[in-house]
Amino acid sequence: MKYAEISSLAIEELKEKIKIEQENLRKLKFAHTISPIENPTKIKNTRRLIARLETALNVKGS
């Protein structure tokens, strides 16, 4: 998601999206621990997406 798309989301949508992506990151890390996943950059990209979402949430919350 681009930051412009993220900033257009409502606060509740941001919170829900953060929960979904955190669960997704947990599953990716678990799968990578058991056997290496095909594209390990998914972990990095998901982590960065969560950071973008949390930043947008903090900006809107202020």
Curated annotation (Swiss-Prot):
Keyword Ribonucleoprotein: yes
GO biological process, one term: translation
Molecular function per GO: structural constituent of ribosome
InterPro entries to which the protein is assigned, alphabetical: Ribosomal_uL29 (IPR001854), Ribosomal_uL29_CS (IPR018254), Ribosomal_uL29_sf (IPR036049)
Pfam families named among the record's database cross-references: Ribosomal_L29
SUPFAM superfamilies named in the record: Ribosomal protein L29 (L29p)
Keywords: Ribonucleoprotein, Ribosomal protein
GO cellular component: ribonucleoprotein complex; ribosome
Listed NCBIfam families: L29
UniProt family annotation: Belongs to the universal ribosomal protein uL29 family.
Name by which UniProt lists this protein: Large ribosomal subunit protein uL29
